[in-house]
Amino acid sequence: MLFRSVPRIARDPWNLDRTPGGSSGGASAAVAAGMGPLAIGTDGGGSIRIPASLAGIYGIKPTYGLVPIYPFSAAWGLSHIGPMTRTVADAALMLNAAAGPDARDPFSLPGPRVDYVKALRGGVKGLRVAWTADLGFAKVVDPEVKAACERAARRFRELGCRVEEIAPKWPSPQAAWKTMFLGGIAARLGPALRDRRDDIDPGLAAIADETRSWSPTQFVQAWFDRLAWEEHPRRLFERHDLLLTPTIACAAFKVGLDGPGEIAGTPTGIYDWIPFTYPFNMTGHPGASVPCGFTRDKLPIGLQILGRRFEDATVLRASTAFEKIAPWAHLRPPV
């Protein structure tokens, strides 16, 4: 939201002093609290998967263009629309309704239409699964989060998958993503920053101010850097069917903050706690967050399941297979 029209902030139903994440945090909190069975999220850097992880629900960012976007968001080229639900089956049902081409979105994907509910019936035996706790560039991951996700990754062996821990040496794409993402927000604000600055969220106004000194060449270079970085997951998916990571590097932190400030004693910047989400907004791969455990403070932890582009059905199938051996829908927050 660009303007400060909402007087209250969303809180995590598992602990009202903690954040449900964003930017679809209100959606995740509502679903987790039982206010409704499903919600739509928009994800330009993790805004489906982050709040799904923090609130202990399921969320999937589909392949870029599978669900059309109109009108375009500030994060065009990065933004995906997808379901946030208590169960994988509900997410598949939502995708059946939402996926498909739209003439108003030139990036929306054509058919053929896929029945994602039907796709849940297949198994995952024989799938080649890669697991990494850092992608090669995560600054720090909370030990409880890492341990829970590692246990969850190992459980895919029970499903008949071939699980391999990998140690990629990928460079961080944060600078390119930040340029594209923040530049889009600044451009979208446009005249409003001049005419209604007092009504604009201070954080967004600060973002717009920061980007004013950036040159057009920086923005174009970010797109080239994006294309270059896409080679890393492309090569990985030549050898593996799925990639597993923590959804984010920590559990829910204090409400009202932009980040935890530190993780396991290591100081963190504003984007250091989401190193696993925004890279795949740049590549367009489908990615889901599945609940996979809790911290000692009873805060949810999410495992991210990523697949090849256009193979959303495989991500959903893996998600429902994990859900069957590690169910979560019966777990309810204390609200």
Regions found by a protein language model. Give the residues of each.
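Short glycine/serine-rich loop segments
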Residues: 1-102, 281-302
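Short, surface-exposed loop/helix-turn segments at secondary-structure junctions
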Residues: 10, 107-111, 184, 221, ...
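Short, Asp-centered acidic motifs that coordinate Mg2+ and/or phosphate
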Residues: 37-38, 241-243
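A short helix-breaking turn/cap at a secondary-structure junction
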Residues: 61-147, 151-152, 170, 325-335
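Acyltransferase
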Residues: 118, 141-167, 189-195, 219, ...
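Short helix-loop capping/hinge segments that flank enzyme active sites or metal/cofactor-binding pockets
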Residues: 118-133, 180-234, 246, 250, ...
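Small-aliphatic-rich amphipathic alpha-helix that forms the alpha element of a beta-alpha
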Residues: 232-235, 265-291
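A short, well-structured catalytic beta-strand-centered motif of the EAL phosphodiesterase domain
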Residues: 303-309
